[in-house]
From Swiss-Prot:
Protein name: Phosphatidylglycerol--prolipoprotein diacylglyceryl transferase
Source species: Bartonella henselae (strain ATCC 49882 / DSM 28221 / CCUG 30454 / Houston 1) (Rochalimaea henselae)
Protein's UniProt keywords contain Cell membrane: yes
GO-annotated cellular components: plasma membrane
Function: Catalyzes the transfer of the diacylglyceryl group from phosphatidylglycerol to the sulfhydryl group of the N-terminal cysteine of a prolipoprotein, the first step in the formation of mature lipoproteins.
Major localization class: membrane
Record InterPro entries: Lgt
Binding residues for a 1,2-diacyl-sn-glycero-3-phospho-(1'-sn-glycerol): R153
Length: 292
């Protein structure tokens, strides 16, 4: 704990990364955040699959019971993809020098972009195996995903990781783990709001007011575009992370971060999904097809 006085809002002393110790086992907010997020996506998807009028041809693309079969695969793919993304893309030198640190996911260190790749592979595999339209499968998962992202970002705040740049704004926070104990943007909470709860509201409105699920790929396309934009904005307020050396050499002092660079392919993917959604003639006349 830093002994210096805080010129802004002091980090709440009651917040601890560990919820409770059960003998030698510790329950972490970070791990619980992932569990709650995945369970919310499962619950919300089941609710929407019951509402036939939301879907193209008034026919949900899958039985609501099947989404439960995907929960385990989604959890595994997110954790494995997210951790591999962190290890291979963000800090390979450290993790290869400290291989035991690779499995300590409860301490944080999960790449959203890696998790997205992991669950995308799982969704494509599951959709093909169960004869589900791939873009519809993307929509089913994407529609509730922002809540999970928002919860995990709050857990980042509790873990005192990914804090923001130094600022004089009155809502600045002093993090005890910051060696300089300076007032900083609570960028984790900015991300929780933009990437999480605000994006969820946008998808909610698109789903219920504009019936976006009737064109498979629309919801997932907007989700990916929305996340990429929100992440790029939040990168402005985040304290710089240690980017790969080759990237730092190319973009030194430009303000263009590695997180922004990783979000660029997401923009292209999101617009591609939207293009496919509105090009697909089968969603105009009510007929469905299983190929993408």
């Amino acid at each position: 704990m830093n002994d210096f006085s805080c010129p802004a809002i002091a980090f709440p002393s009651f917040l601890n990364p560990v919820i409770v110790h059960l003998g030698p086992i510790a329950l972490y907010w970070y791990g619980l955040g992932y569990v709650v997020g995945i369970l919310f996506v499962w619950w919300y998807a089941q609710k929407l699959l019951k509402k036939q009028s939301l879907w193209y041809a008034n026919h949900p693309p899958m039985d609501k019971e099947k989404i439960g079969d995907f929960v385990v695969w989604s959890a595994i793919s997110i954790v494995v993809g997210g951790r591999l993304g962190q290890v291979l893309v963000w800090d390979p030198i450290y993790y290869f020098s400290h291989p035991t640190a690779i499995i300590t996911i409860w301490n944080g260190g999960m790449s959203f972009h890696g998790g997205l790749i992991g669950i995308t592979i799982a969704m494509i595999w599951f959709a093909r195996k169960n004869n589900i339209k791939i873009r519809a499968m993307f929509d089913i998962i994407a529609i509730g995903a922002p809540i999970g992202i928002g919860i995990v970002r709050i857990c980042n705040f509790i873990n005192q990781e990914l804090w923001g740049n130094v600022t004089t704004h009155p809502w600045a926070v002093c993090f005890p783990l910051d060696p300089y104990y300076l007032p900083r943007h609570p960028s984790q909470l900015y991300e929780a709001l933009m990437e999480g709860f605000l994006l969820f509201v946008i998808l909610f409105i698109l789903t219920f007011a504009f019936k976006a699920l009737k064109r498979p790929g629309t919801v997932s396309g907007i989700f990916i575009i929305g996340y990429a934009i929100a992440r790029s904005i939040s990168e402005i307020y985040r304290a710089p992370q240690e980017d790969p050396e080759w990237f730092s050499t190319l973009f030194h002092s430009t303000g263009f971060t590695y997180g922004m660079a990783l979000s660029l392919p997401m923009l292209f993917l999101g617009f591609y999904l939207l293009f496919q959604a509105f090009k697909d003639e089968s969603t105009k006349n009510g007929h469905t097809q299983t190929k993408n």
